[in-house]
């Protein structure tokens, strides 16, 4: 039934799929003798996306094409089209190399590990996590700042492979096709250009330790982890086919690129803007291996990362899209949370813009959006479970800026307005 024929509500329209009335949903779309609400449309889109993603994952006869990979990345990551293209091609080639590795021994295809360079909160980690989800391979993430050379206090490089093995549920064969993301690699840069009598165990020493596992070696991994169980039996894991993705903000790299010079500034097509007039992401796109060497990475480490992908700064429009558009967008997450209290949550356009502007002012990128949302909604989430009949909570610009309280719309009031109309 799409219409109610009883009493005052005889003209009320209902969704033909979930049965909700036009007052319970944001939009009701009419068709020939049927209606569908916006929530059912979103649910249908989610089902179609999941089926498409499953088709990509299960198509083992042919590795997903770069376009297919990029299309799924678009569902989760806003913007960064250049980085997505670079990653999609590199990952496609990597797994195609694994699939056809034994069919032609005349030409040996080398592994192409990836280096992601971009400001904080621009999506480096999310890109790596989404890639692993698309390909249905084990994935682990390591923080380079916690690593030290073997024999020193800190985490051994081999522990990265142990985490990957744990993600693969100790299936060595699956782990050997996994993806490792090493974050904060810019923090293990060489501390000084001049050799020192004190050993740099958390900088250049870690780079040296990572070389072998990134290039390909058989690592001996203790199943219980680390140095606490020296008598245990070791597992042998070949890292040749593990894809390593390294990421870092590389603060100050843009100054090194700027000091290198950008070639000629003469001619009609020349960009005559100074470094201060250009955005950081725009400058980082011109990075060369020599710039990374000046930053403090050793030549051998740079050589193990032949694929460079740079990410752009996120502007206000991009952050607004991140808040509302992806499949697991923050706004959708909080709306789902409020639905559990039988309450709808709505953000005005100027509220989303104000949240994005706050994140830019804090220089935290997309990573800072959740913290801002938590602060805005804290009092509401504290009070709401104890309130009755709150139908909707509305957040506007004044609420984000702390100049007003969220607007509570009660079910009785909405019904009174509807009956008087």
Swiss-Prot record:
Which SMART domains does this entry report, sorted A to Z? AAA, ClpB_D2-small, zf-C4_ClpX
Ligand binding (ATP): 119-126
Q: According to its record, what are the GO cellular component terms?
A: HslUV protease complex
Identify the residues that the record assigns to the ClpX-type ZB domain, covering every copy.
3-56
The record's listing under Gene3D superfamilies reads: 1.10.8.60, ClpX chaperone, C4-type zinc finger domain, P-loop containing nucleotide triphosphate hydrolases
GO biological process: what's one of them?
A: cell division
What the entry lists under CDD domains is as follows: RecA-like_ClpX
Molecular function (GO) terms for this protein are:
ATP binding; ATP hydrolysis activity; ATP-dependent protein folding chaperone; protein dimerization activity; unfolded protein binding; zinc ion binding
Is ATP-binding set as a keyword in this record? yes
Task: List the InterPro entries hit by this protein, alphabetically.
Answer: AAA+_ATPase (IPR003593), ATP-dep_Clp_protease_ClpX (IPR050052), ATPase_AAA_core (IPR003959), Clp_ATPase_C (IPR019489), Clp_protease_ATP-bd_su_ClpX (IPR004487), ClpX_bact (IPR046425), P-loop_NTPase (IPR027417), Znf_CppX_C4 (IPR010603)
**Domain of life per record:** Bacteria
Its keywords, alphabetically, are: ATP-binding, Chaperone, Metal-binding, Nucleotide-binding, Zinc
The record's comment on protein family reads: Belongs to the ClpX chaperone family.
Cross-referenced PANTHER family, in alphabetical order?
A: ATP-DEPENDENT CLP PROTEASE ATP-BINDING SUBUNIT CLPX-LIKE, MITOCHONDRIAL, ATP-DEPENDENT CLP PROTEASE ATP-BINDING SUBUNIT CLPX-LIKE, MITOCHONDRIAL-RELATED
Q: What is this protein called?
A: ATP-dependent Clp protease ATP-binding subunit ClpX
The source organism is Paramagnetospirillum magneticum (strain ATCC 700264 / AMB-1)
Taxonomy-wise, where does this protein's organism fall, top ranks first? Bacteria, Pseudomonadati, Pseudomonadota, Alphaproteobacteria, Rhodospirillales
Q: Tell me the name of the encoding gene.
A: clpX
